[in-house]
Swiss-Prot record:
It catalyses: Preferential cleavage: Xaa-|-Leu > Xaa-|-Phe. Residues 1-25 form the signal peptide. It comes from Bacillus sp. (strain EA1). This is Thermolysin. The lineage of its organism: Bacteria, Bacillati, Bacillota, Bacilli, Bacillales. Zn(2+) binds at H372, H376, E396. Ca(2+) 2 binds at D368, D415, E417, E420. Keywords: Calcium, Hydrolase, Metal-binding, Metalloprotease, Protease, Secreted, Signal, Zinc, Zymogen.
């Protein structure tokens, strides 16, 4: 069994270099995308003015048209898709590149404006689309594209026609297929049986060819499930590892049951019984006496309790209200399938298998596993990292990082291992992955050792070890490959990676862009000449990411 694939880019394969930018190299810096010959991260005093924040972005891009090569006025090439004010008072905007009204897949630009000054741009835009022979009318229909994707799933993934669920609507995009952008359909095929999947297909709109495909289990959409009316109460039960926990429940006098429904956090935390079937969400967990000590209860106790801990961590440490930032309800189903050796975020809720008792215990028994999977939901609502190649490895690393930080926050025998509480119960000291020593379980701890094949969506669970090691070194310090890193502690490390994830990364960010994002996040939080900034640079140097 491949441990690395248990917890669950685009072929842009970015190579990046840092260069001084503009007349004042001391004030401005840039990470350069070698493939597209355009910037992917620019920071410094870029442009000042009294215009609306988005107008500053348009003006700057127009002034630097020879650098960004958009081929026209920026306001005609970019669509503002998000605007917010962060905790530092910065106006943070997300723009999506368009070509004749059609979205360019993965081409998202994040801009920061502070006190009337444009201070950073993050994200890769595809240049000179007007100079290419790009079609904007499809030769095949949406229905044909969807049939092609579903048939490929049946042929290559499930070996039978899956029972498809509603996924994201199919849409036309300009897809950067290597160095040749093409008009394509983005098709989402989502299913639970015979095995769970959430596949993204890029189908050539001219001839129906499959340009790319990957399993992105973590695409988000609003969840379902109905709460019960009743009185908030506190129950008690025993978790997977035998520890006692107090849990928030709801008593319904109408039904005469206590339900695993926590009304004290956001829009609620709900835990369901899958009854060893593969239908979601199952039944809202009910109990007659508010005491959950049966062995069958254990997985539900942990799923419910740990979901509350994750909610509290993001709220109390980062000021984030649930995974979407707007207090979305958190729903979990336990006892999914029979002996199912995995856990996943299916786009609307958490799903936990019971494990087979030998390789895995019930997955909800690992607090870092719960934190890991719910962080995928946070990523979906922020950077939206494509679950393939380096962007996918960053996606996985973010979940490992914050799953571990949740474990330390709860102070439940915390360590830098992933999944150690529920993996191979008969083997002491074993885990799925290690942040402190990725090589312990066969994962790379330096960019020179990265996996470059196509398995595991391009090594998302493998190459995450490189970023995990950088995060560990940033927190704890140490010497790695001859590079000395001064540790700044877990709290500051978490703040930096959170800010990079939420306010700087884009769907196709790679490791070099992550480095630039973390450097900028540290500068925002602690100052550009701070030890924290130096430590970020040291940590990424130590793992060979520049």
């Amino acid at each position: 069994m491949d441990k690395r694939a248990m917890l669950g880019a685009i072929g842009l394969a970015f190579g990046l270099m840092a260069w001084p930018f503009g007349a004042s190299a001391k004030e401005k810096s840039m990470v350069w995308n070698e493939q597209w010959k355009t910037p992917s991260f620019v920071s410094g005093s870029l442009l000042k003015g009294e215009d609306a924040p988005e107008e500053l972005v348009y003006r700057y891009l127009d002034q630097e048209k020879n650098t960004f090569q958009l081929g026209g006025q920026a306001r005609e090439r970019l669509s503002l898709i998000g605007k917010q004010t962060d905790e530092l008072g910065h106006t943070v905007m997300r723009f999506e590149q368009r070509y004749r009204g059609i979205p360019v897949y993965g081409a998202v630009l994040v801009a920061h404006v502070n006190d009337g000054e444009l201070s950073s741009l993050s994200g890769t835009l595809i240049p000179n689309l007007d100079k290419r022979t790009l079609k904007t009318e499809a030769a095949i229909s949406i229905q044909q594209a969807e049939m092609i994707a579903k048939q490929d799933v049946a042929d290559a993934v499930t070996k039978e026609r899956p029972a498809a669920e509603e996924g994201k609507p199919t849409r036309l995009v300009i897809y950067p297929d290597g160095e040749t952008p093409r008009l394509a359909y983005e098709v989402n095929v989502r299913f639970l049986t015979p095995v769970p999947g959430n596949w993204i297909y890029m189908i050539d709109a001219a001839d129906g060819k499959v340009l790319n495909k990957w399993n992105q289990m973590d695409e988000a959409k609003p969840g379902g499930g109905q709460p019960v009316a009743g009185t908030s109460t506190v129950g008690v039960g025993r978790g997977v590892l035998g520890d006692q926990k107090y849990i928030n429940t709801t008593y319904s006098s109408y039904y005469g049951y206590y339900y695993l429904q926590d009304n004290t956090r956001g829009s609620g935390i709900f835990t369901y019984d899958g009854r060893n079937r593969t239908v979601l969400p199952g039944s809202l967990w009910a109990d007659v006496d508010n005491q959950f000590f049966a062995s069958y209860d254990a997985a539900a106790v942990d799923a419910h309790y740990y979901a509350g801990v994750v909610y509290d961590y993001y709220k109390n440490v980062h000021g984030r209200l649930s995974y979407d930032g707007s207090n979305a309800a958190i729903r979990s189903t336990v006892h999914y399938g029979r002996g199912y050796n995995n856990a996943f975020w299916n786009g609307s809720q958490m799903v936990y298998g019971d494990g087979d008792g030998q390789t895995f215990l019930p997955f909800s028994g690992g607090i870092d596993v719960v934190g890991h999977e719910l962080t995928h939901a946070v990523t979906d609502y922020t950077a939206g990292l494509v679950y393939q190649n380096e962007s996918g490895a960053i996606n996985e690393a973010m979940s490992d990082i914050f799953g571990t930080l949740v474990e330390f926050y709860a102070n439940r025998n915390p360590d830098w291992e992933i999944g150690e509480d529920i993996y191979t119960p008969g083997i002491a000291g074993d885990a799925l992955r290690s942040m402190s020593d990725p090589a312990k379980y066969g994962d790379p701890d330096h960019y020179s050792k990265r996996y470059t094949g196509t398995q595991d969506n391009g090594g998302v669970h493998t190459n995450s070890g490189i970023i995990n090691k950088a995060a560990y070194l940033l927190s704890q310090g140490g010497v790695h490959y001859g590079v000395s890193v001064t540790g700044i502690g877990r709290d500051k490390m978490g703040k930096i990676f959170y800010r990079a994830l939420v306010y700087y990364l884009t769907p196709t960010s790679n490791f070099s862009q992550l480095r630039a994002a973390c450097v900028q996040a540290a500068a925002d939080l602690y100052g550009s000449t701070s030890q924290e900034v130096n430590s970020v640079k040291q940590a990424f140097n130590a793992v060979g990411v520049y």
